[in-house]
Amino acid sequence: MRPASEVERRRLNDLFAELCAIPSPFGRERAIADRVAGDLTRLGFEVAEDDAAAGTGAECGNLLARIPGRSDRWVMLCAHLDTVPHDGAVEPVLVDGGWESAGHTILGADNKAAVAVLMAVAQRAAVEGCPIGVELVLTVSEENALAGAKAFDVGRLRSRSGFAFDHASPVGEVVVASPTYYRLKAEFHGSAAHAGIRPEAGRSAILAASKAIAAMALGRLDAETTANVGSITGGVGGTNIVPEHCAFLAEARSLSDTAVETAIAEMVDHCYDAGNDPACECDVDVDVERLFSGYRHRTAAPGVLAAEAALRACGYEPRRILTGGGSDANAFEANGFPCVNVANGTERNHESSERVSQAALEGMLDVVIALLDEVAEA
């Protein structure tokens, strides 16, 4: 397949801006799902929505669209429709050759850059055909611990492997390892008392939680492992009350299952140790959930080699990277379906300064087109 034409590049940019302007925080993807499904249907492709909404709480399910190819082989291409929550409308604007949000909100390039690219591939295929059958999987609630992809039934796929395009780093990078991720919720239940008259009668839940957090190893624990406390709530607002309740949310993640399990176990121990401290004795409830599992691709994994070949064909020097972030690829890999995550050139995802250059957006389109050729010829 030839590289994208100037007309295709212009259409890609226009479509990207239109998609970014459609609000789609996780759980509220109906509007963008309807837009994308409608466009694919008008192109003549079969589109189906699954029942993931029932389990994820989203407004709609995942979309699966099939684009027939000139061979009887198939490959899956994945992007997610949702974004992180945001306030206010998104107004995409071009600044110095790149797309940004005009306001103080996210742009939504995560992952609408990939959605736009896959839609551009579908537009090309509708006119010129495709060397291999393509299954587009457009998921919901990726930003909610990969909920949509985890609910997707990979048994519906004709493909034997696939690719996601959901890493905020320069085009050319290929993710070869991603972490296992645990989330911890700790609640401390003490007893209230007047802080100025009878503080001895109270048991401070905030003090207990603080001691637990202070004892934890947080930040980068080693080259492959991180831990963080992300939020804490407690007390009733008055400084004259010994607080009887406090809770916090934390996480640990690592490319090593052994390391992350050790880290999360130590965090749990610190919670109970703090609850047993005579200075702030509290009842402690700790809930730990494994939200997704990690993976590490083999050196000669076919998907990795195909991605690298496609990148070289487009003039990029491939670079294999390890990441501390998760993507739908984690969910597919956990379900036994090989999936390689390829960087999409976006920058500063989840921030008001989020950006993607036109060069990166258009480059990804060329890479995906080349990738279909590589997979078809493999």
Question: What spans do the regions from the language model cover?
Answer:
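N-terminal capping segment at the start of a domain
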Residues: M1-G27, R290, E347-E351
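Glycine/charged-rich beta-loop-alpha catalytic/anionic-binding loops adjacent to active sites
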Residues: P92-T105, H189-A193, C314, T346-H350
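Alpha-helical metal-binding/catalytic segments enriched in His/Glu/Asp
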Residues: L77, D96-E143, Y182-F188, R198-G219, ...
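Metal-dependent amide/peptide-bond hydrolase catalytic core
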Residues: A4, R42, A205-A378
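Catalytic-core environment of secreted peptidases
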Residues: L63-A109
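Acidic/histidine-rich catalytic neighborhood of metal-dependent amide-processing enzymes
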Residues: G103-P179, L221, T226-V229, G234-N240, ...
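A non-catalytic alpha/beta surface segment that caps or lines the substrate-entry region
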Residues: P25-D72
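Acidic, glycine-rich active-site loops and adjacent beta-strand->loop/helix elements
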Residues: A53, L81-T83, V137-A145, H167-S169, ...
